[in-house]
């Protein structure tokens, strides 16, 4: 495996994050008003959750992506609470080979009552007519956050990438992360540099995220998407 560190990666907020300034302004609204807006926007998703596996009982709780169902969220995760759910939408990619394409994404962020979140993303390519053409990259990983609001995210992808990200909340509705270690297998993307990600709730309560990568000494867009809550 090859490794790149993020010493040269800028600590600035990703410039292409959807509606970043609007998201900051939205974060300043009264807490009760924010809850009311979210409840109205997500009422159709409120009763949905991950389907049970149905393969027999195990002595640990099932994962839940709905804070109203299953085990209570661990107190240590309150700083990441708004992320929990099943999200789905579309985005744009500029991969390490220079190819640009549209993609669809389903992102599941769940918990089982322990002090971490599970992270599962699956993407599919979309053609010029908006039709899905087949599976793309999958990611699985975990989020943790310390009492000092220090975030750790680890993940591995189906195309041979393993990364460690560190970060912190940008505000109550956004989280910024920067890669500390980027490892690529022999068959993985050769030109993938260190990067940074930002996730945040937008004014419409959708989840926006952007991944930027270091290319020839500057941060450039890699992937970004806007996702609607479909469960949780």
Description of each model-found segment:
Residues 51-54, 134-136, 192:
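Signature of extracytoplasmic/envelope-associated structural regions
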Residues 81, 110-111, 144, 168-169, ...:
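Well-ordered beta-strand positions
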Residues 58-65, 121, 145, 177, ...:
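A generic structural signal for ordered alpha-helices
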Residues 2-116, 214-232:
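Amphipathic/hydrophobic helical signal segments and adjacent flexible N-terminal regions
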Residues 63, 70-76, 91-94, 125-129, ...:
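Short secondary-structure boundary micro-motifs
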Residues 97-189:
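Central antiparallel beta-sheet cores of small beta-barrel/beta-sandwich binding domains
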Residues 184-232:
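Mixed-charge, glycine-accented linear interaction segment located at domain edges/termini
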Residues 86-92, 120-122, 142, 154, ...:
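Residue-level recognition of well-ordered beta-strand positions that form the cores
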């Amino acid at each position: 495996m090859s490794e790149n560190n993020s010493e040269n990666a800028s600590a600035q907020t990703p410039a292409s994050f959807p509606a970043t300034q609007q998201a900051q302004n939205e974060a300043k609204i009264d807490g009760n008003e924010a809850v009311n807006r979210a409840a109205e926007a997500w009422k159709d998703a409120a009763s949905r959750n991950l389907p049970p596996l149905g393969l027999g009982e195990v002595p640990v709780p099932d994962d839940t992506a709905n804070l109203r169902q299953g085990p209570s969220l661990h107190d240590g995760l309150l700083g990441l609470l708004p992320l929990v759910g099943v999200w789905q939408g579309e985005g744009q990619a500029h991969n390490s080979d220079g190819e640009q394409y549209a993609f669809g994404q389903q992102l599941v962020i769940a918990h089982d009552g322990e002090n971490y979140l599970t992270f599962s993303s699956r993407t599919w390519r979309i053609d010029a007519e908006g039709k899905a053409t087949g599976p793309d990259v999958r990611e699985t990983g975990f989020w943790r956050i310390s009492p000092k609001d220090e975030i750790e995210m680890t993940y591995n992808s189906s195309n041979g990438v393993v990364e460690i990200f560190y970060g912190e909340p940008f505000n109550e509705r956004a989280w910024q992360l920067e890669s500390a270690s980027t490892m690529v297998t022999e068959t993985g993307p050769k030109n993938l540099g260190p990067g940074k990600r930002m996730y945040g709730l937008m004014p419409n309560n959708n989840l926006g995220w952007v991944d930027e990568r270091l290319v020839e000494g500057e941060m450039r867009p890699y992937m970004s998407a806007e996702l609607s809550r479909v469960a949780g």
